[in-house]
Amino acid sequence: MKWALYALGLFVALIVLVFLIGSSLAGHHTATRAARFHQSPETIWGVITDYSKFPQWRKNVTHVESLPAVNGKPSWREFDKYNNALPYEIVEWTQPRRLSARIADPNLPFAGTWLYELTPQPDGSTSLRITENGEIHNVFFRFAARFFIAYTATMEDYLKALGQKFNEKTAIED
């Protein structure tokens, strides 16, 4: 019986510690990752804005639903293998150089935007830089994102998947 009480006490202490650490972390973060591709900005733009084809090259997206346009710009919902849905809307569209997409569900434990910047390089390649301006409202999720998931993991996966789409090896840059 004493052992069970000690175990319960340790578990509660761990939960409190995670809560305190998560509460002390900033709710907002900015993270950036980039990669170069041997493609034109127009080619990359065509792929990253054709959300209906995301499941063909992004392994974590199983299907996509079109949603009504918001302010004349595209909006869609992505589903993962667990059928979790994330709605997105475009907030900036400057073809083929700059795109900004926002998570469009205020009830999620996180929010934010991804800014995609495509820059042609002298050698004919294109640099794609993604900047995430994110907010994590839930302190437990904030703790997990900081210590276990990494703020840049999704961007890195996205850039690697894009490289695979083009049959290119992707070197991730800060």
Residue ranges and their predicted role:
Residues 48-58, 80, 159, 163-166, ...:
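Sec/Tat-exported extracytoplasmic proteins
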Residues 52-87, 96-98:
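Short beta-edge strand/loop motif at the mouth of beta-sheet-based domains
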Residues 37, 41, 47, 57, ...:
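Solvent-exposed, acidic/flexible segments
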Residues 41, 48-51, 87, 115, ...:
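Extracytoplasmic/secreted envelope proteins and their assembly/folding machinery
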Residues 43-48, 54, 90, 99-101, ...:
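Hydrophobic pocket/interface hotspot
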Residues 2-69:
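Hydrophobic ligand-binding cavity/cleft-lining segments
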Residues 103-157, 162-164, 168, 173-174:
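Beta-strand/loop substructures that line and gate deep hydrophobic ligand-binding cavities in soluble
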Residues 2-20, 24, 81-125, 133-136:
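Hydrophobic-ligand binding "helix-grip"
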